[in-house]
């Protein structure tokens, strides 16, 4: 079985599959992805494969520069997005935005 290239919390699976979540915000450990990369996607909880995505772009962002567009691309409110990022990456301020499209 092929390993997954990137994982998402299971709660985001349906939004990714439906095209409602089109970015992911990660820390430096996952800053190596680039436009054109095709990635196997698994669930964080069990590493079960659920789709393939293509990276369409990358950029950097800080917690303070997250905006409504980022929130919309994550399919959540801006306050919720900032809270989720702060929970996942406590004490970090520099992040990497990975834009993607689901290929199935």
From Swiss-Prot:
InterPro entries: AC4CH, ASCH_domain, PUA-like_sf
Active site: 21 (proton acceptor), 24 (nucleophile), 74 (proton donor)
Domain ASCH residue range list: 6-94
GO molecular function: hydrolase activity, acting on carbon-nitrogen (but not peptide) bonds, in linear amidines; N4-acetylcytidine amidohydrolase activity
EC numbers on record: 3.5.1.135
Recorded catalytic activity of this chain's protein: N(4)-acetylcytidine + H2O = cytidine + acetate + H(+); N(4)-acetyl-2'-deoxycytidine + H2O = 2'-deoxycytidine + acetate + H(+); N(4)-acetylcytosine + H2O = cytosine + acetate + H(+)
GO cellular component, one term: cytosol
Keyword DNA-binding: no
Keyword Hydrolase found: yes
UniProt xrefs under SMART domains: ASCH (SM01022)
Family matches, as Pfam families: ASCH (PF04266)
Record's keyword terms, sorted: Hydrolase
Functional note: Catalyzes the hydrolysis of N(4)-acetylcytidine (ac4C).
Protein's name according to its UniProt entry: N(4)-acetylcytidine amidohydrolase
Source organism per UniProt: Salmonella newport (strain SL254)
Annotated gene: yqfB
């Amino acid at each position: 079985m092929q390993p997954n290239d990137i994982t998402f919390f299971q709660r985001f699976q349906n939004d990714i599959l439906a095209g409602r979540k089109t970015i992911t915000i990660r820390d430096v450990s996952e800053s190596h992805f680039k436009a054109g990369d095709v990635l196997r996607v698994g669930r964080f909880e069990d590493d079960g494969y659920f789709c393939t995505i293509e990276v369409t772009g990358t950029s950097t962002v800080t917690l303070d520069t997250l905006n409504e567009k980022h929130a919309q691309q994550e399919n959540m409110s801006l306050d919720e997005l900032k809270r989720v990022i702060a929970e996942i990456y406590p004490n970090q301020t520099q992040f990497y935005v990975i834009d993607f499209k689901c290929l199935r």
